[in-house]
């Protein structure tokens, strides 16, 4: 089963409720994630964790970074309440933070790159995957209360000495159990992000997935079936191609098709993007990966802004394909950055 199919298995619903004061003095909130099967609406899985304001603020920063790299302009990323020292225990502030956290989680629902991100899965780490019906059943079937009975004389003789009892208590100090493997697997099934992607990148700066790149390149699935060239040969090919971008149109049909369609020269945004991307290719070849990454991002940003107003349908298609190629190239640079 493909990753795309896995992502579409569940409908998601998030709630943030029941604020309470932790014994250490800060406020924490109950976060409930419900995963409703599309095949069987009665099949509902639930994950509950307790989080504080700083946890939500970190998640907000991580997801905002990912959202910016998606170049989505149709929706505005939700703001989050600012940190404050005074008044943070007031009911109005607690409610504002609760609602801000809930809005953040619900914003991720229609965006696969966010709701299946490693950052969101890490946020729910430690929560046990349960079914609401099982929880209610467990609450109804409670064991009978334990009634203490006075120990018999025989039991009193078998009791350990105080020193032995102290030693036994020291050995029986409870420790927090490590997350079990089945629990980890259950969480992984709900958040279908690639584990190798998590290991190769930091949680806050994960690379974009193939599904996200497909937003810009409708032919990405067809092209991905062939063997990929080596890093060196691909760089050389892209550099030669970029040198011709200001001379040839960014469309499959060539210059004759462009001139026959509208008779106008290539728009200015293509020249600006060409200059940035050409320099980015040179920086990458020289090993200046940070500068190259910035150049790719700025170049792709100009392309996607300009293509929305481009009157040529064929050129728009070509620009989207080029933007996807250079965006994918930018993502490979994450492996070289410290």
UniProtKB/Swiss-Prot annotation:
It is found in: Cytoplasm; Membrane; Cytoplasmic vesicle membrane. Residues 266-338 form the MIT domain. GO terms for biological process: protein transport. Residues 1-131 form the PX domain. The modification Omega-N-methylarginine is found at residue 106. The modification Phosphoserine is found at residues 202, 228. Transmembrane segments: none annotated. It is a peripheral membrane protein. A 1,2-diacyl-sn-glycero-3-phospho-(1D-myo-inositol-3-phosphate) binds at residues 52, 54, 88, 97. InterPro entries: Intracell_Sig-Traffick_Protein, MIT_dom, MIT_dom_sf, PX_dom, PX_dom_sf. GO terms for cellular component: cytoplasmic vesicle membrane. Keywords: Cytoplasm, Cytoplasmic vesicle, Lipid-binding, Membrane, Methylation, Phosphoprotein, Protein transport, Transport. Homodimer. Interacts with SNX1, SNX2 and SNX4. May be involved in several stages of intracellular trafficking. Overexpression of SNX15 disrupts the normal trafficking of proteins from the plasma membrane to recycling endosomes or the TGN. The PX domain mediates interaction with membranes enriched in phosphatidylinositol 3-phosphate. This is Sorting nexin-15. It comes from Rattus norvegicus.
């Amino acid at each position: 089963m493909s990753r795309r199919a896995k992502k579409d298995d569940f409908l998601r619903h998030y709630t943030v409720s029941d604020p309470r004061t932790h014994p250490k003095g800060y406020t924490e909130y109950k976060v409930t994630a419900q995963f409703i099967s599309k095949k069987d609406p009665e099949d509902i899985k639930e994950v509950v964790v307790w989080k504080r304001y700083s946890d939500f603020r970190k998640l907000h920063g991580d997801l905002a970074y990912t959202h910016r790299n998606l170049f989505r302009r149709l929706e505005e990323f939700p703001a989050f309440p600012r940190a404050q020292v005074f008044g943070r225990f007031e009911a109005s502030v607690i409610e504002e933070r609760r609602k801000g956290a809930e809005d953040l989680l619900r914003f991720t629902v229609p965006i696969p790159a966010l709701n299946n991100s490693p950052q969101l899965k890490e946020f729910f780490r430690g929560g046990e995957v349960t079914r609401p019906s099982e929880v209610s059943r467990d609450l109804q079937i409670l064991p009978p209360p334990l009634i203490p009975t006075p120990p018999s004389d025989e039991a009193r003789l078998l009791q350990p000495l105080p020193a032995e009892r102290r030693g036994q208590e020291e050995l029986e100090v409870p420790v927090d159990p490590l997350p079990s493997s089945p629990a980890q697997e259950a969480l992984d099934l709900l958040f279908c992000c690639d584990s190798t992607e998590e290991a190769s990148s930091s949680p806050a700066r994960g690379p974009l997935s193939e599904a996200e790149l497909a937003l810009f390149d409708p032919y990405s699935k067809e092209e991905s079936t062939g063997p990929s060239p080596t890093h060196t040969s691909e760089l050389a090919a892209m550099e030669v191609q970029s040198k011709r971008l200001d001379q040839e149109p960014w469309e499959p049909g060539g210059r004759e098709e462009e001139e026959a369609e509208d008779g106008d020269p290539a728009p200015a945004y293509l020249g600006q993007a060409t200059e940035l991307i050409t320099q980015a290719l040179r920086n990458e070849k020289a090993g200046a990966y940070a500068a190259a990454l910035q150049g790719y991002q700025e170049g792709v940003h100009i392309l996607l802004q300009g293509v929305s107003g481009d009157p040529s349908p064929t050129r728009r298609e070509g620009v989207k394909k080029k933007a996807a190629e250079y965006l994918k190239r930018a993502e490979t640079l994450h492996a070289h950055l410290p």
